[in-house]
């Protein structure tokens, strides 16, 4: 992937718009790489409905906006170079994801078919915070923006192009999370989920738990 990016470097230097398109395009490609962000939005949409899924997705999008904004000004590099801060982010974020995975598996260990007719209600900030913490605690988000911006953008890239790239990333993130929320909160999808609710929740919870344990392990061992 990075070799392909380098092939466009000459064009990027000549035309800042190419840098914008390439930056946003590479970000969109990551949507198809399953990670904690995807599974948290999917699980929330299935268990708690469209509103909860959208709010969780918006939290993830805000995290993307924050880290991409830092990356545009080189501040994200400072975070990764400070091992103590980077390790703390991993440990705290991993602990939160582990707690969420455990609660999800435990809550869904008994049939709750009524949730299909009446989605679980909670204050909006509960779901929004869930998405935000999940994204901010994911070191891959930081490393991605650092690596991509270091290749697609340079010191000569004008401010307007940087802002366009940032806006494109934020907009793409919002559209993708809302799409996921809509798709996995459809009545047909939730009915199918209800028929295999116990197994599905445990599988998704286990996947999120694996991401959480990896974050904690990396945070502890790489200090």
From Swiss-Prot:
Major location category of this protein: membrane
GO MF, one example: amino acid transmembrane transporter activity
Keyword DNA repair appears in the UniProt entry: no
Membrane topology label: Multi-pass membrane protein
One Gene Ontology biological process: amino acid transport
Pfam families per the UniProt record, alphabetical: LysE (PF01810)
Chain segments annotated as transmembrane: 22-42, 59-79, 85-105, 164-184
Intracellular or extracellular location(s): Cell membrane
Keywords from the named record: Cell membrane, Membrane, Transmembrane, Transmembrane helix
One cellular component term from this protein's GO annotations in UniProt: plasma membrane
Source taxon at top rank: Bacteria
Cell membrane is among the record's keywords: yes
PANTHER family linked: ARGININE EXPORTER PROTEIN ARGO, TRANSPORT PROTEIN
Family per similarity comment: Belongs to the Rht family.
Name of the protein in its database record: Uncharacterized membrane protein YahN
């Amino acid at each position: 992937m990075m070799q392909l990016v380098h092939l466009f470097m000459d064009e990027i230097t000549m035309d800042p718009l190419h840098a914008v398109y390439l930056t946003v395009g590479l970000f969109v490609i990551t949507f198809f790489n399953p990670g904690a962000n995807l599974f948290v939005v999917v699980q929330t949409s299935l268990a708690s409905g469209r509103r909860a899924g959208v709010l969780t997705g918006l939290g993830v999008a805000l995290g993307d906006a924050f880290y991409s904004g830092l990356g545009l000004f080189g501040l994200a590099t400072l975070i990764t170079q400070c091992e103590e801060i980077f390790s703390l982010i991993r440990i705290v974020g991993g602990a939160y994801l582990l707690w969420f995975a455990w609660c999800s598996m435990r809550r869904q260990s008994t049939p709750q078919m009524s949730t299909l007719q009446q989605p679980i209600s909670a204050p909006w900030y509960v779901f929004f915070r869930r998405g935000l913490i999940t994204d901010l605690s994911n070191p891959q988000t930081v490393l991605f923006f650092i690596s991509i911006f270091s290749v697609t953008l340079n010191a000569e890239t004008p401010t307007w192009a940087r802002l366009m790239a940032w806006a494109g990333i934020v907009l793409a993130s919002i559209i993708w999370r809302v799409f996921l929320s809509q798709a996995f909160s459809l009545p047909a999808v939730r009915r199918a989920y209800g028929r295999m609710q116990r197994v599905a929740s445990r599988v998704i919870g286990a996947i999120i738990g694996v991401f959480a344990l990896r974050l904690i392990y990396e945070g502890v061992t790489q200090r």
